[in-house]
Swiss-Prot record:
Catalyzes the phosphorylation of the 3'-hydroxyl group of dephosphocoenzyme A to form coenzyme A. InterPro entries: Depp_CoAkinase, P-loop_NTPase. GO terms for biological process: coenzyme A biosynthetic process. It comes from Streptococcus pneumoniae (strain ATCC BAA-255 / R6). This is Dephospho-CoA kinase.
Length: 201
């Protein structure tokens, strides 16, 4: 069984920067968001579940999901958010478990980028968990800029996940992304070489 490292963070904290860098270094890195996108394509397991629940109005003329509408339906209603988390969580976990088993056969070390790693209790899948951390104000600002959201909309999306401060206490390693990209990737280099960012383990 290969060594599996989980990568997590929050919306707009810089997870994908780390995941892309790891791929450039030759590592396999499963991106849970990309898996979700595949499952949400027409005919995918999540697509079918979402259309059955919300109805045809969430399908665009080209047959794809209307993601902005879907996000607003889910994020504006706590009940819908709860349903979405549960059903999507179950289907996604099954798909990720299959990918994990496949990679464990061939890879000495590989990574899985899972945004809700702690919230949905994936911790015991991993030998280590790396958290990409950024201060709350910077996170809100980056999210507003990236997705063209108002401050209230950005805050509402962040509220759907645990605060990064809470995740910080649970992670094996913390990658600080309050600086620039080079500083972030330098920390990844140190971990890949077996160094330790801190002495908590």
């Amino acid at each position: 069984m290969g060594k599996i490292i989980g990568i997590t963070g929050g919306i707009a904290s810089g997870k994908s920067t780390v995941t892309n860098f790891l791929r450039q270094q030759g590592f396999q890195a499963v991106d849970a968001d990309a898996v979700v996108h595949q499952l949400q394509k027409p005919g995918g397991r999540l697509f079918e579940a979402l259309v059955q629940h919300f109805g045809q109005e969430i399908i665009l003329e080209n047959g794809e999901l209307n993601r902005p509408l879907l996000a607003s339906l889910i994020f504006s209603n706590p009940e819908e958010q709860k349903w979405s988390n549960q059903i999507q969580g179950e289907i996604i976990r099954e798909e990720l478990a299959t990918l994990r088993e496949q990679l464990a056969q061939t890879e000495e070390i590989f990574f899985m980028d899972i945004p809700l790693l702690f919230e949905q209790d994936y911790s015991d899948w991993f030998a280590e968990t790396w958290l990409v951390y950024v201060d709350r104000d910077a996170q809100v600002e980056r999210l507003m800029k990236r997705d063209q959201l108002s401050k209230d909309e950005a805050e509402s999306r962040l509220a759907a996940q645990w605060p990064l401060e809470k995740k910080k206490d649970l992670a094996s390693q913390v990658l600080d992304n309050n600086g620039n990209q080079n500083q972030l990737l330098n920390q990844v280099h140190i971990l890949l070489e077996g160094g330790r960012q801190d002495d908590r383990d």
